[in-house]
């Protein structure tokens, strides 16, 4: 049976994700104690009901969250279940704003401030985050974008044979993407921003792309980076990962990182992988 565990930070969009999966035909249950995971799955199997899978929501509200959660995952996988763990996150600033908009207390402790609650929650969920199949950063998403991302993740990534790589360009000025598995800094390359004829254009413009890719250091970097990815991706597959997010950053996320992201993605596609490209800050830089 396919099992999707939804977890992550309060205010990061877990409820929206659950509703999206219910619409896709998954049976969803919220705040189930970890010790009951396997028994619940067995009951669903015996019921004879037809579902695409089961969604189990667990977060800081669970009293037994810190004891046995990773072991529970291993147990479910050991008896043949396809288990995915989706961890939803967002920047502290975004989470604080969302709590202010809803006027809710933070569930970590009703007596603490929201920022303190977020800090406590991050500590308690650290092991879950480390064992996630996929981390989804919802900081920049609206409700519709979040639903789309969840559906794409569920429909697109189902095992190492369909390993998916998302290559994201970003600007360090706006922060590192929270869901990045690998982060590469390409600020060592010459910056088209200081070439007046190139400054107005992004790294998708042929002239800017040519400027970046024809630098001697660029060729060497791409060769070394691609060799590293050829080593890492099979290792991720062996560990049961089905999704890798590579974040490539420059100062503003408009020129160098965009060109390098597209060049990296083109090389990865030659390996037969599913590759997605996104340029987070291309309109900001």
UniProtKB/Swiss-Prot annotation:
GTP binds at residues 59-62. InterPro entries: P-loop_NTPase, RapZ-like, RapZ-like_N, RapZ_C. The keyword 4Fe-4S does not apply. Pfam families: PapZ_C, RapZ-like_N. SUPFAM superfamilies: P-loop containing nucleoside triphosphate hydrolases. Keywords: ATP-binding, GTP-binding, Nucleotide-binding. ATP binds at residues 8-15. The keyword GTP-binding applies. GO terms for molecular function: ATP binding; GTP binding. Displays ATPase and GTPase activities. Belongs to the RapZ-like family. This is Nucleotide-binding protein Glov_2163.
């Amino acid at each position: 049976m396919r099992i999707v565990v939804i977890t992550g930070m309060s205010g990061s969009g877990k409820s929206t994700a659950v509703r999206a999966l219910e619409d896709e035909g998954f049976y969803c249950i919220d705040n189930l104690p970890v010790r009951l995971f396997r028994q619940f799955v067995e009951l669903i199997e015996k019921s004879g009901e037809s579902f695409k899978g089961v969604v189990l929501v667990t977060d800081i509200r669970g009293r037994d969250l810190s004891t046995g959660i990773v072991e529970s995952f291993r147990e479910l996988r050991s008896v043949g279940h396809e288990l995915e763990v989706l961890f939803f996150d967002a920047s502290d600033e975004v989470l604080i704003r969302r709590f202010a908009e809803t006027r809710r207390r933070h569930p970590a402790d009703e007596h603490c401030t929201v920022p303190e609650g977020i800090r406590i929650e991050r500590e308690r969920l650290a092991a879950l985050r480390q064992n996630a199949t996929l981390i989804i950063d919802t900081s920049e998403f609206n409700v519709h974008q979040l639903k789309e991302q969840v559906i794409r993740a569920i429909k697109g990534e189902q095992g190492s044979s369909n390993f998916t790589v998302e290559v994201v360009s970003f600007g360090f000025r706006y922060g590192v993407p929270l869901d990045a598995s690998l982060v590469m800094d390409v600020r060592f390359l010459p910056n088209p921003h200081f070439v007046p004829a190139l400054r107005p254009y992004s790294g998708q413009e042929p002239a800017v792309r040519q400027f970046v890719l024809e630098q001697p250091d660029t060729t060497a970097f791409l060769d070394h980076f691609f060799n590293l990815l050829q080593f890492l991706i099979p290792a991720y597959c062996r560990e049961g990962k089905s999704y890798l997010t590579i974040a490539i950053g420059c100062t503003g996320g408009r020129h160098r990182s965009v060109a390098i992201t597209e060049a990296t993605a083109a090389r990865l596609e030659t390996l037969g992988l599913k590759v997605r490209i996104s340029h987070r800050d291309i309109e900001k830089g």
